[in-house]
Structures are given as C-alpha cells and as structure tokens.
C-alpha cells in the first residue's frame, strides 16, 4: 500500500511508500478522491476535542471509510464498524487498517453506510428544518 498525506507539512518515512500532497483548497476534493481509507489520528487533549468532525464528514462525502481516534467529535459521527472505525490504541490502528486494506468489499460497505449516514444526518435537507426552527425560536423570543 501507499500512504498518501494531504498536509501543509513535509514528511519522510523511509520505511514505507509515502506520497505527500500539499493541501490546497482548490484541489482538496480531487486529492481526497485519490484515497481508499481516510485516517484521522488526533491527540487526546483539550484542543483536539472539537476536531475531527469535518474531516470525517469529508471522508464520508467522497465515499471512503474513515478511521479516527476515539475522541472528541468523531465519537458522535462514527458508528464503529458500520460507517467507519474508532480506535484508541496503536494495536487497534494496526488491526483496523489491516482489516480494511485486506477487504475491499468491507471498505465498499462501510463507505456506502457512511455516505448514507452523512446524507441522512448532515446534509442540507437533513438539517434545514432544525436550523429554521432555531431561527424561528430566536425571532419569536426576540419579539416577545
């Protein structure tokens, strides 16, 4: 396998086949479409609590299974083993990646579930009524 990093940093790992693509807003979608599995390891600290949600949703949107640290926002988006994977230890990272790398059918099923869940829970159609209700509530509260 090849590890593809889309980042603003330079990396070199002599132990593996690695390609680094500089992150650019203009090419982000086409770059994400080059991957088979989306990885989102984060540190378990206060700063990282709000991270992970958008990245996981981007993986879901381009149809790849996401694997994320079991921490923060990712815990609320990923249904472990259904639409992605949550991992906590180095061994869990290894086990889940091996499972996904070796099983194209599983990757396809997880990807399909992820896209379905994204559309069901986070698309414009899924959230528009919620936002309208919130805005109406604010407006009505302000009028009283």
Locate predicted features.
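Conserved beta-strand positions in the Rossmann-like core of class I SAM-dependent methyltransferases
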Residues: 4, 67, 85
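Nucleotide-activated donor-binding/catalytic signature segment of Leloir-type glycosyltransferases, i.e.
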Residues: 4-34
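Cofactor-binding loop segments of dinucleotide-utilizing enzymes, especially the Rossmann-like FAD-
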Residues: 8, 69, 89
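Nucleotide-sugar-dependent
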Residues: 25-31, 38-58, 68-76
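Structural loop-to-beta junction motif characteristic of Rossmann-like glycosyltransferase folds
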Residues: 37, 61-66, 82-83
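Conserved acidic donor-binding segment of nucleotide-sugar-dependent glycosyltransferases
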Residues: 79-91, 99-105
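A short, well-ordered alpha-helix in the C-terminal region of glycosyltransferases
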Residues: 99, 106-121, 127-133
């Amino acid at each position: 396998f090849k590890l593809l990093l889309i980042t603003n940093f330079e990396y070199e790992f002599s132990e593996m086949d690695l390609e680094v693509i500089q992150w650019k807003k203009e090419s982000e979608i086409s770059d994400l479409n080059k991957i088979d599995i989306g990885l989102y390891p984060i540190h378990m600290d206060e700063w990282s609590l709000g991270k992970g949600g958008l990245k996981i949703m981007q993986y879901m949107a381009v149809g790849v299974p996401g694997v994320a640290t079991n921490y923060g926002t990712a815990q609320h988006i990923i249904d472990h083993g259904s639409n992605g994977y949550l991992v906590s230890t180095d061994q869990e990272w290894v086990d889940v990646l091996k499972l996904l790398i070796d099983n194209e059918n599983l990757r396809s099923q997880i990807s399909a579930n992820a896209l379905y869940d994204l559309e069901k829970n986070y698309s414009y159609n899924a959230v528009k009524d919620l936002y309208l209700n919130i805005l109406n509530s604010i407006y009505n509260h302000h009028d009283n």
